[in-house]
Amino acid sequence: MTGYEILKKALLRLGIKNDNNALNLRAIEYINQISSDLRGNAIENLSDTLSTNGEFCEAVTVGLTMMFTLTVGDSAANKIYTDLYNAKRAKLLSAGDTVEDKLPKGDSL
C-alpha cells in the first residue's frame, strides 16, 4: 500500500475530502513516525510503497487518523483512534513472540 492510499483512507475516516500540499507533507512525516514506532520502513514520497502487510498498513492508517484528530482538535475521535491504534500496535508487535517452556540442565538444578 502506498502512502497516498493510507492518507486517503485516513482522510475518508475523518470525512475530509480535500487534501493539499501542506497536508501531504504532514502526512509523510506522520506516516514515517508511525512506521518507525511499528518497526517499519520510512517513505520519502506518498507514491512510495510502505508495506504489503495488510495488518501493518491498517495500523499505520489508524495511527495517521489518530494524528490528524489531534491536529483538528477532535478529542472524542482522538480517544477512539488512540485506543484502536494501541490495540493494533500491540497485536502487530507481539505477532512474532513465542513463549517456550525450558527445564534447567546440568548443575543449575
Where are these regions (language model features)?
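Charged, low-complexity interaction regions
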Residues: 18, 71-77
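Catalytic-loop motifs flanking and including active-site residues across diverse enzymes
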Residues: 3-6, 57-61
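Short, well-ordered coil↔helix boundary/capping segments
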Residues: 51-59, 75
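Short, hydrophobic/amphipathic alpha-helical patches that form generic packing surfaces
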Residues: 58-72
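Conserved short "hinge" loops at termini or chain/domain junctions
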Residues: 1-52, 83, 87-109
